[in-house]
A protein has these predicted regions:
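Low-complexity, rRNA-contacting terminal tracts
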Residues: 1-55, 73, 77-176
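Active-site-flanking beta-strand signature of metal-NTP-handling nucleotidyl enzymes
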Residues: 58-62
Length: 176
């Protein structure tokens, strides 16, 4: 069976070369934490997750700091048993990136996201966002569900794919 273009694009991203990402990572580290991108870097992944090249779709690159989430240490006084230095967030970095994108672009809704690169300090995600007020989105039969009021603030309520994965809702388990 013949393989299409998106298959080969996906194969190229499975083993990215160092030269391909090194200059981009340097630029991304120096840039802002939330940046609107003209087109998705991984077109195959974006199309799989629902991206369409039409009005109303926006791709945002988000930079998330990696590592443990620590609170500042007490300078004086005794620390109680309940108060720990390390904060357990129970959220994966991708969900954090989606929430930050939703906070930065309040008129858009998060559709999905994917990892594009990570280094020792940061993880970079592309978040696909949709403008629910655009007529192109309202008239699209496959995307008009996001205009419904029940899908407002999806990222904050844990309704995106990354949030469901982080909460363990991908598979149904026997709770007996």
């Amino acid at each position: 069976m013949a393989k299409g273009m998106y298959h080969y694009v996906g194969e190229a991203w499975k083993k990215p070369t160092r030269e391909m990402l090194q200059t981009r990572l340097i630029q991304w580290r120096a840039g802002e934490s939330a940046t609107v991108v003209d087109k998705p870097l991984r077109l195959d992944r974006a199309r799989t997750l629902g991206y369409k090249a039409k009005k109303g779709f926006v791709v945002v690159r988000i930079r998330v700091k990696r590592g443990g989430r620590k609170r500042p240490r007490h300078e004086h006084g005794r620390m109680s048993r309940k108060q720990h230095i390390r904060k357990i967030l129970k959220m994966n970095y991708q969900w954090v990136a989606e929430i930050r994108a939703a906070n930065h672009f309040t008129n858009l809704e998060v559709l999905n996201s994917y990892l594009i690169a990570k280094d020792g300090k940061y993880g970079f995600y592309e978040v696909i966002m949709v403008d629910p007020d655009k007529p192109e989105i309202k008239n699209d039969p496959t995307m008009k569900w996001i205009c419904d009021g029940a899908n407002r603030k999806r990222a904050h309520r844990g309704l995106t794919s990354a949030a469901k994965k982080s909460r363990g809702l991908r598979t149904k388990r026997n709770t007996l």
